[in-house]
Amino acid sequence: MLPAIHNIQEAGAANAPRVFDEEKDNVCAYKHISRGDAAGEISKAKHVISRHFETPWTEHAFLEPECAVSYIDQDGDVFIYSTDQSAHQTLHECCMALGTDKVKVQNALVGGGFGGKEDMTVQHHAALLTYVTRRPVKVKLTRAESLLVHPKRHHFEMDFTMGCDENGIIKGVKAKVYTDTGAFASLGGPVLERACTHAAGPYNYQNFEIEGTAYYTNNPPAGAFRGFGVTQTCFATESLLNMMADEIGITPWEIRYRNAIRPGQVLPNGQIVDESTGLVETLEAIKPYYDEAIAAGKPVGLGCAMKNAGVGVGIPDTGRVKLIVGDDGKVHIFSGASCIGQGLGTVLVQMMVSNTDLTRDDVVYERSNTWISPDSGTTSGSRQTLITGEACLRACEKLMEDRRSGLSLQQMKGRVYYGEYLAKTDPLGADVPNPVSHVAYGYATQLCILDKKTGRVEHMIAAHDVGKAVNPLSCEGQIEGGVVMSMGYALREKYPIDDNCKPIEKYGSLGLFRAHELPEITALVIDLSLIHISEPTRL
């Protein structure tokens, strides 16, 4: 039996056995990001704190296990109903596996994903069986199989050093991070990259350096999971800020308010933030709750975060929408973007009705497919409302040209209106003074209030700068879900692995919060378009 690689230390050891013989070592990915002189500024800082941090694996725990149904359709093609995060990606991979382009994919309603359904799992098995037998096939994983197969949130080990002046102003941060990406790459490289690009936090300082290494081990694979690596490095940065506030003698709220990025300032990655940046507003929104809790003597926890929208870092990121006026006299919305529970269909319909003279009854949202709907990339990276939404607006503008000319929907039957938006960004290391890493960021401040007698979480307040809230109720739902998931991650969820690198937990023992165990959650949607009176910014 070959020796197993159980952890990051074994994977990175000299002369370690290789998980893949064709690789020279166990390094899946390496990233180095540097701006300014972090080491120099830290050496001159009045206050310096260094700490080691670790975060565990966690399971997505989506309600619906992976499932695919396939059959031969009337055109002789292998037709796949799939619950995944990109119908077009499934199409490409199944075509490669079968050696034919006679494949169609349509998304069924997806019972949750959170990144756990980005990798193909059962679709190709169903497609292959149908291709060989010419019979309908359904492949659905049991819960135990699902827990074993799909990638998890990465285990991280991190060493961070932060330097601040006497007023708590950050002068520099230097870090090294190591991730266990398991026995397959999955999205280990992109997750590491996102962790590194966001590790500096949403603050105004210019001296930052980070090295990141993702290692192959024989553990279950790790990949995309809500936050995509940002949650891990955010935990380290925010923990250091709390320690720094204690050392300097100011409150956790005050140290964040002093350092918070503001419009026109420059993030540690060099990107200049615009007027839509609302981190300060999220801090101000939770301040009354914070002050009230402190006055009552209740223990509180506070944290800020930023997260990209869109793929960014120079990678092509395109949204596409096709509007077709059908024989029924209605406008049908076709987009290749999977709707996995975040409400994309609702958002596109809202955008359609809000930016045309049509009523809700005039519009039909069609599920993502690969033969009519144009490819809009994966439903991941908080990108679909922004990227595909902008494509929808552009298609609406073309449709309205015909409407303004006096045409009725009956006269427009059969017409197709196509919208496309490419989010242009700069690659990592671009030789420009102020690279655009991402077309947009979201900012948030979270406040946790404990019961001073029991130590249990009593109240969570989450203030999120979301840009334009297309559907505020849906935004609140996403915030509440994120809070619950993060509470489990921070407090009690676990995904232990035995000495043979095999997971040993069942769904019921993962440590998920039950509904009756949850605290009060207040979701504050910070929409700066409603706070500042200004012309809306179009992409």
Where are the predicted features?
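Cytochrome P450 core scaffold surrounding the K-helix E-X-X-R motif
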Residues: 467-471
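Structural alpha/beta core scaffold segments of enzyme domains
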Residues: 1-464, 496
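Residue-level detector of conserved catalytic or cofactor/ligand-binding positions
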Residues: 529-539
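Active-site "cap" helix and flanking loop/linker of ATP-utilizing ligase/carboxylase catalytic domains
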Residues: 473, 477-509
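Generic long, charged, amphipathic alpha-helical segments
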Residues: 364, 514-530
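Contiguous domain-boundary segments centered on the initiation and propagation of an alpha-helix
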Residues: 38-39, 292, 496-517
